[in-house]
Amino acid sequence: MNAALNQWKDTHAARLSQYSAVRVSGRVSAVRGILLECKIPAAKVGDLCEVSKADGSFLLAEIVGFTQECTLLSALGAPDGIQVGAPIRPLGIAHRIGVDDTLLGCVLDGFGRPLLGDCLGAFAGPDDRRDTLPVIADALPPTQRPRITRSLPTGIRAIDSAILLGEGQRVGLFAGAGCGKTTLMAELARNMDCDVIVFGLIGERGRELREFLDHELDETLRARSVLVCATSDRSSMERARAAFTATAIAEAFRARGQKVLLLLDSLTRFARAQREIGIASGEPLGRGGLPPSVYTLLPRLVERAGMSENGSITALYTVLIEQDSMNDPVADEVRSLLDGHIVLSRKLAERGHYPAIDVSASISRILSNVTGRDHQRANNRLRQLLAAYKQVEMLLRLGEYQAGADPVTDCAVQLNDAINAFLRQDLREPVPLQETLDGLLRITSQLPE
């Protein structure tokens, strides 16, 4: 009997430690936008609470800060129906999720609750008996991150020739509105070799989300995917949390030794949602009109992707740029955090050049780890040709260019049509890596030494 009790205690000790024997409660003293003010003794930042509504239902809220007078809670949904004096019951746990294979094929909200699909969801309440993990967590220590050495072809010539990705790499996809970033993201999901795909769709229009589900994801792709969605009409807390929920789900599959592809669209909308939370919490505005919490949370989010001893998370984060300017504060910060960036050009999109990837402006910081010397040399020569053509493009349009002054520029002008044809590609027509490399070598070999 004692042995059985000891075994039960060891099994459930970690779970029991999350709960308190005494339920301390409080009451709402003020509602300020998305923030609720109250007094809760012994509360901790990150703890979840249940707030009673006037109709008898409950609203989940999370403790996000304190002042000298009160505790600040951020509502995880719309605070409609909350009255001053409404009872608050601390749950004694932080936001946690349970992840298993039943999530594959499911569509979840920003907190991990099911939106579509016959599944339990990932959100773990206080009575959840699954093994759970925290949504807000630290990244792996740097000493536990293996070096990126394996290439991960995308089937897209413009990427595989000049910006070849590696398994476990974190890449930004920078684009303005209407440049085809969502279409490119879906194409990457179809083509890249991975076990599980986790989509984080933040701030999307509801119509676009439904079209994405119906037209971009076939049954085969859907069967190995998890979608975490927080549309533009959802609360700022849910939009910001969706990025962490998607990342935590990807981490859980990585811990099981799987190759995970994390596609997060977009970091800009995540930053905007966190800006709303920060302003409501009384944070001062800093660089670019953003509160300090945005610059704190961006690296905490993206550093959680990457290689581990067991598996990998290859992450692609989209970033919205206005007027094709890379000087946007979010874009500038994200570019400094990631292992590479792919830039989509509005000018190329307007010419019908798809995918509209500006190879000259795009870069991979781990390219030398996953490519051979011949590939690197050909990539450098391709960039040399593109740069040479860009320098004389205006002269060519004006009819003022005179050949013979520079053999490299002359070659760039002669090969421009061939290069553009090589970099263009139709959807759903992936090209093998070796075929891409052969085409790249065939073009760049014509450049004089």
UniProtKB/Swiss-Prot annotation:
Q: What are its E.C. numbers?
A: 7.4.2.8
InterPro entries with a match to the protein in the record = AAA+_ATPase (IPR003593), ATPase_a/bsu_AS (IPR020003), ATPase_alpha/beta_chains (IPR050053), ATPase_F1/V1/A1_a/bsu_N (IPR004100), ATPase_F1/V1/A1_a/bsu_nucl-bd (IPR000194), ATPase_T3SS_FliI/YscN (IPR005714), P-loop_NTPase (IPR027417), T3SS_ATPase_C (IPR040627)
- Locations listed in the record: Cytoplasm
What are the UniProt keywords, alphabetically?
A: ATP-binding, Cytoplasm, Nucleotide-binding, Protein transport, Translocase, Transport, Virulence
Please tell me whether the keyword Heme is annotated for this protein: no
A Pfam family annotated for this chain is T3SS_ATPase_C
Q: How does it assemble?
A: The core secretion machinery of the T3SS is composed of approximately 20 different proteins, including cytoplasmic components, a base, an export apparatus and a needle. This subunit is part of the cytosolic complex. Forms homododecamers.
Role according to the record: ATPase component of the type III secretion system (T3SS), also called injectisome, which is used to inject bacterial effector proteins into eukaryotic host cells. Acts as a molecular motor to provide the energy that is required for the export of proteins. Required for type III secretion apparatus (T3SA) formation, proper protein secretion, host cell invasion and virulence. May play a critical role in T3SS substrate recognition, disassembly of the effector/chaperone complex and unfolding of the effector in an ATP-dependent manner prior to secretion.
Q: What is this protein called?
A: Type 3 secretion system ATPase
State the species of origin: Pseudomonas syringae pv. tomato (strain ATCC BAA-871 / DC3000)
